[in-house]
Amino acid sequence: MDMDNQNTKIYTDKFLAVTSLLFVFISVAGLAIYSQESIKIAATWMQWTTSVFTTPVLLFAFLAIIFTFGLAFSKYGKIKLGEGKPQYSTMSWIFMFILSGIGSSTLYWGFLDWAYYYQTPGLSLPPESAEALKYSVAYSFFHSGLSAWAIYALASISLCYSYHVRKNKGLSLASVIEAVTGFKSTGVVGRLVDLMFLLCMFGALTISLVLTAVTFTNILSQLTGIPNTFMTKVIIILAVSVLFALSSYVGMDKGMQRLSHMVCLGVVLFAIYVLCFGPTQFILNNSLMSFGLMATNFVDMSLFTDPMGDGKFTREWTVFYWLWWISYAPGVALFVTRVSKGRTIKEVIFAMVIGGSVGLWFIFGVFENYSVYSFIHGAVNVPQILSQQGGEVAIGQLLSLLPAGKLMMWIFLGIMVVFLAAHMDAVGYAVSATCTRGLSEGQDPSPNARLFWCVMLTLVPIAMIFSKAPLDTMKTATIVTALPFIVIILIQTYGLVKWLIQDYAKVPSHLIEQQGYDDQEIGLNQTQDEHAKRMQLELASSIKLDRKTS
């Protein structure tokens, strides 16, 4: 770390923290006091926003894939993000940012996502038909695959480049916006951006935390007879917060790494168990067919606006999912930036888009197809239970059918708790980093700040549980907070393109690659000016050499 970084004053932006909490407390009070009115307003707002912004959201997600893969395969993909060797092993690195990007509700959607699409299918298919069932898992693969992770990559690369290559101080969105537009991160625009980010994190975490708490307490009640009440759910949420606190105090290097390894290993082993002791042949066959259906219909799924119909599926699922991923994108970008020093742009893009997609396809392929098989053979009527009793009841019944069912239910609960703690750790880090001014490369917000924000992040989900808000209301919390970030990510991307052209447009591909090797060996720690001068000298040497040989 250079002297300039060491002398930077680190402090908490109290105005930003207090303002964001004020908004949160008002929202919580509204949900608690005016529950039914809030639910009705949320339903109206969701209908309007998803109808108006369908086309822009679909185009944004589709173009994100084109841009990120184009960047990865270009010469700019060889640019190294920071000097020296990577701080984390490749496996730990991938585990950590995958967990920052997917919530513990993945275990909920992993068993039930297909059932929603079976009841209300896309591509104008008849509801609850053989065709709807055929495409149900394919659509789940689509919503958890390339487009989603490309959105994360698009938001992450610009922040990584600003922080590690351009050496812009401050690990927050406002710092990037300041570097691109000139608006001060501590000014009105900068604070508005960070305020929207903080509120976005509260909205994004709501669905994950609520679905996890509801599923956990239902299965726990089946196993132990403990009443499945509001207080039980609150106790579970607070218990997870304590686990998160332990992770925060241990630190990023030990706490988050350990949690991420525990979760990923636990989920993979659990999926392998279901694959081996469940309907193995059906799971493999339907997973392969679903992947093929997704691949052959990818463009149709990406751009399906349903102008001849009511567009309900696109609004309620594809647009919702893309906005949910967008709502998490800024937080994921902050976390990915923190753990990606020493990686190349291509490595970050491929690890996120390919690694993240394949990981979720495996999990969803196993869990969903086990659920589909149970439905087809009459063991568990998942769609009916989902509609009448709730998805958490269906998951409990599905788990109980496995060999050593009760043991598997306990293991599932353990994985779910650690999964949520790891996810909250990542989100808490992003939020506390945003409220901490002056962070330079390699510096982290204090454990106390991360713990404080973790507790605050539980307020909105607890209010949702108290008001018995339906899934659509929780979706609205995500959608409303996510929309502005399409514009912010586009501004980040504009800045990234501008910086790449300024810094590397005239630098040959082999010199960019060579610089990465040199930095890894020497461990250079250059400022922007030193970096630019070095590039100019190498370019001049290359031109002279070409002239001599010609």
From Swiss-Prot:
Entry GO MF terms: transmembrane transporter activity
Organism domain of life: Bacteria
Protein name: Carnitine transporter
Disruption phenotype: Deletion of the gene abolishes growth on carnitine as sole carbon and energy source, but does not affect growth on acetate.
Stored Pfam families: BCCT
Statement: the UniProt record of this protein carries the keyword Protease: no
Family, similarity comment: Belongs to the BCCT transporter (TC 2.A.15) family.
UniProt-annotated location(s): Cell inner membrane
Functional note: Catalyzes the energy-dependent uptake of carnitine and is essential for growth on carnitine. Can also mediate the uptake of choline. Is probably a proton:substrate symporter.
Gene Ontology CC terms: plasma membrane
Keyword Hydrolase set for record: no
Main localisation: membrane
Keywords (A to Z) from UniProt: Cell inner membrane, Cell membrane, Membrane, Transmembrane, Transmembrane helix, Transport
InterPro entries linked: BCCT_transptr
Activity regulation text: Inhibited by the protonophore 3,3',4',5-tetrachlorosalicylanilide (TCS). Not activated by osmolarity.
Residue spans crossing the bilayer: 15-35, 53-73, 92-112, 137-157, 196-216, 230-250, 263-283, 317-337, 347-367, 401-421, 451-471, 477-497
Topological relation to the membrane, as annotated: Multi-pass membrane protein
Organism of origin: Acinetobacter baumannii (strain ATCC 19606 / DSM 30007 / JCM 6841 / CCUG 19606 / CIP 70.34 / NBRC 109757 / NCIMB 12457 / NCTC 12156 / 81)
